[in-house]
Amino acid sequence: QAQKLESAQFINSFSSQEISTLAGIPVAYGVDLYKVRYYTSDARGEEHIASGLACIPQDDTVRFPLACYQHGTVDGREDVPSRLAGGYQLPLILSAFGYVTCAADFVGLGDSPGIHPYVHATTQATAGIDLLFAVREMSEDDNYPPFYVTDQLFIGGYSQGGHASMAAHKYLETMYPGEFDIAAAAHMSGPYSISEVMIDFTLGDQPYNTVSYLAWVALGYMEAYPELLDTFTLEKVFKPEYLDDIKAFRDEAIGRGELNSRITNRLMTDYGAVLCREILLEDVLNSILSDPEYPLNQALMDNDVYDWAPQSLTNLYYCEGDDQVSFENAILAANVMTQNGAPNVQALRMDNTFPLNHVQCVSPAATSVVFFWGSMQQLLTSANDIELDDEVGIYYANDLLILDIPVSYSSSDLELKAYSLDGRLISSRPVAAGMSEHLMNLDSESMIVMSLFADGRLIKTQKFFTR
């Protein structure tokens, strides 16, 4: 593994109080933010320098799990996590719950030159993974303030980031087995089926308001597939009246939001509705809808990310009211993955009471992820006296804690400590090997961490939700 870290620069700090206010729920840690520059491959496979954000909890006595967070669609080059703009709040909040969270800007955004290959699975995956390697190197580098990471890894992302997190998840399990211990993956509202579900959703007879996505896909894939799409130009894909605006976006003269409103206004004027299909030349539209061998369709199919079998715990969060990414992406992905033999994949609906659109779905999905990840998270002390023992059992229900400690610990000095979510020691008591029950009285705590020590060494740590 060649070195990935080029440099890291401190940007800002947020206290736990500030983050709690931002999140609307109490968090455990303040967080330091760093802009990280690192080496990764561009769409042509050439190594270059990209940028991303590292969010580090402010406690160097704890070894934290890593989290790979992939951001959703942004407005353009500067609207990225490392600029504390698009997509930085969620990784910041996740970090405050005890994760060293990495959020790549992606290729063609932030410091990475060129056109961003939008929803290009390979570069989204490698940009996210190479940032993980860079931040792990940073934790071992004496030139930076000390922080410590475990091998445990959590993966997540929303919207474009759901597609990107799924791509990174697949890469990590298939190309980097053993590099990280993937505890859980949470893919939220992602377009996993680019070539089928998203094409039907965007190019059908119904209005589709984020029409700029289509232009960015075309620009990005022409960049990523120069051989496959060698005969394609913007002029051969889009109707002439849309070309100037798409080129202005390509040249970074306008952002995606401005491009979207310009195309939307023209479609409303010409057709009375935002029909995405109407920006495409007729022969291009017909070929996309009818010919699987059409080069653009081949490129789209190459970026479907659902036809595999994740072995780690995987949740796909969706809203049926989603107006930008059809919820059928999550249903299809969960079904195909399960048929492929994935042991633990489920699609979870977030808008059971009333429909939520793409923006409204963020909050319930992200809150669910905090609890989903939290149930799997292991926080370890940064000291080296850790020998976790899978034979030790700690179980909790209705204020009753049950310990199952192998008799091999009979001669050890055993101590059980309970910590609150914000790291306070709630109780400490001596315990004995074998089976034992303990009444805890934890009415005021929503979540606790139980840690068992043998002769001062941590041998088991387990997190429980108490209500």
Q: PLM ranges: what are they?
A:
Residues 387, 428, 443-467:
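C-terminal tail/sorting-segment detector
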Residues 378-409, 467:
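Residue-level detector of functionally pivotal "anchor" positions at catalytic/ligand-binding pockets or at interdomain
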Residues 188-307:
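Accessory cap/linker subdomain of secreted extracellular hydrolases
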Residues 44-47, 51, 58-93:
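Short, surface-exposed "cap/lid" segments of acyl-processing enzymes
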Residues 315-322:
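Short beta-strand/loop motif that positions the catalytic acidic residue
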Residues 1-62:
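Catalytic-loop region of hydrolases
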Residues 118-142:
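Alpha/beta-hydrolase active-site loop
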Residues 199, 292, 297-299, 324, ...:
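C-terminal catalytic histidine-bearing segment of alpha/beta-hydrolase fold enzymes
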